[in-house]
């Protein structure tokens, strides 16, 4: 069990931000990353659709063998986390609570913004997560096209900046000093987002906090791979055409991505 990989799941390349954080924190651990590109994007689909597609992929990953699952997708975390934790014997880590914890501790004026896909914002998953911090003044905003820009390999352009100004207007007007990037694709757009909201606003990505959660769970359950073990072998797969994911993945993650298989 200790030598099985950590499973990381997303609809596309966004979860690679989480994968990178896990690789940096746990370099001895192998990863099994699956992108459900056949059903991308999740952010514009209904909760029922995301649950159906996501659980089908997670079923396959568990059958293939993983010691822990990371749902590295905010839309999927909000739609199927409870089902996944009831369905599988392996621990399941998600990305919403880690980001909320970090934002609550980071805000200075108590005004926190959350941006995400339409599905994530409509689910009110972040509203529910912040219920335990009633002193926080929360502002949420959907950013429908951000994921499309990332999946097209665009991280800075005039069109992107115009979209960002429109989407982020409620955050700026409210005076939020902390902004949760509530989609794992969004850290790739951090430069454009910072240009709009200003350098004084702290951008919170769930990636590093999620990696720490993975570490804590592995240690508490005795699932860490021995440091003396051979170098890990990572596996990457896509449910759709693997070529676009492979091309973008190498750009965003680096040489760790080798051959991408079709799931």
From Swiss-Prot:
It comes from Acidothermus cellulolyticus (strain ATCC 43068 / DSM 8971 / 11B). The active site is at 73 (proton donor/acceptor), 183 (proton donor/acceptor). PROSITE patterns: ASP_GLU_RACEMASE_1 (PS00923), ASP_GLU_RACEMASE_2 (PS00924). InterPro entries: Asp/Glu/hydantoin_racemase (IPR015942), Asp/Glu_race (IPR001920), Asp/Glu_racemase_AS_1 (IPR018187), Asp/Glu_racemase_AS_2 (IPR033134), Glu_race (IPR004391). The keyword Isomerase applies. Gene3D superfamilies: 3.40.50.1860. One of its GO terms (molecular function) is glutamate racemase activity. It is an enzyme of class 5 (isomerase). HAMAP family: Glu_racemase. Its EC number is 5.1.1.3. It comes from the Bacteria. It catalyses: L-glutamate = D-glutamate. The gene is murI. The lineage of its organism: Bacteria, Bacillati, Actinomycetota, Actinomycetes, Acidothermales. Pathway: Cell wall biogenesis; peptidoglycan biosynthesis. Provides the (R)-glutamate required for cell wall biosynthesis. This is Glutamate racemase. Keywords: Cell shape, Cell wall biogenesis/degradation, Isomerase, Peptidoglycan synthesis. Substrate binds at residues 10-11, 42-43, 74-75, 184-185. The keyword Cytoplasm does not apply. Belongs to the aspartate/glutamate racemases family. Pfam families: Asp_Glu_race. One of its GO terms (biological process) is cell wall organization.
């Amino acid at each position: 069990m200790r030598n099985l990989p950590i499973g990381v799941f997303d609809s596309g390349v966004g979860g690679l931000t989480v994968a990178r954080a896990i690789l940096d924190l746990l370099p001895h651990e192998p990863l099994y990353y699956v992108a459900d590109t056949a059903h991308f994007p999740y952010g514009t689909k209904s909760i029922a659709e995301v649950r159906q597609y996501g659980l089908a992929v997670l079923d396959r990953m568990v059958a293939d063998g993983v010691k822990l699952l990371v749902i590295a997708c905010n839309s999927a975390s909000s739609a199927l986390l409870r089902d996944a934790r009831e369905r599988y014997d392996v621990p399941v880590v998600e990305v919403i609570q880690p980001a909320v914890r970090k934002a609550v501790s980071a805000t200075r004026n108590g005004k926190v913004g959350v941006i995400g896909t339409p599905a994530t914002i409509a689910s009110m998953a972040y509203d529910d997560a912040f219920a335990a911090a009633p002193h926080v003044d929360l502002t949420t905003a959907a950013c429908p096209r951000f994921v499309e820009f990332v999946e097209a390999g665009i991280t800075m352009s005039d069109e992107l900046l115009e979209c960002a100004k429109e989407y982020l207007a409620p955050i700026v007007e409210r005076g939020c000093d902390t902004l949760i990037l509530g989609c794992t694709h969004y850290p790739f757009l951090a430069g454009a987002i910072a240009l709009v909201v200003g350098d004084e606003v702290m951008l919170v990505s769930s990636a590093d906090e999620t990696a720490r959660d993975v570490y804590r769970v592995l240690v508490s359950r005795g699932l860490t791979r021995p440091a003396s073990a051979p170098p890990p072998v990572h596996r990457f797969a896509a449910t759709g055409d693997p070529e676009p994911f492979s091309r973008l993945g190498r750009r965003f993650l680096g040489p760790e991505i080798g051959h991408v298989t079709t799931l």
